[in-house]
């Protein structure tokens, strides 16, 4: 782990004020182009607790983000996460749903995703 930078501390403080949630860590994901992706998963690691919440901030290229319910896996919800967007995954998100950032068929530039979490 690395210490919080001034910029990340500012973002974290704004998020906590806006959401009334507490975050102890941030994970960076870099998607370099349309070929970079992150397949279907839930952020349900033991250290995040039983029903974790995650705040996701997108920077750079707009990318499609997909959700599907565990009991209805053939029905997908597509969202376009644009530069500066905030997506909150709160109570039930990780226990009832999976999500992914799929590969794109269109050329894409860099996208950075910051996922703020609370490690217990």
Residue spans for each PLM region:
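Non-heme Fe(II) oxygenase metal-center motifs and adjacent flexible, charged/small-residue loops
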Residues: 1-120
């Amino acid at each position: 782990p690395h210490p919080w930078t001034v910029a990340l501390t500012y973002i974290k403080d704004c998020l906590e004020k806006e959401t009334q949630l507490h975050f102890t860590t941030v994970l960076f994901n870099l998607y370099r182009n349309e070929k970079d992706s992150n397949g279907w998963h839930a952020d349900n690691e033991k250290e995040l607790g039983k029903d974790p919440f995650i705040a996701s901030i997108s920077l750079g290229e707009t990318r499609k983000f997909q959700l599907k319910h565990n009991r209805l896996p053939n029905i997908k919800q597509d969202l376009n996460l644009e530069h500066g967007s905030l997506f909150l995954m709160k109570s039930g998100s990780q226990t009832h749903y999976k999500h992914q950032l799929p590969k794109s068929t269109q050329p894409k530039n860099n996208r950075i995703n910051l996922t703020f979490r609370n490690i217990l």
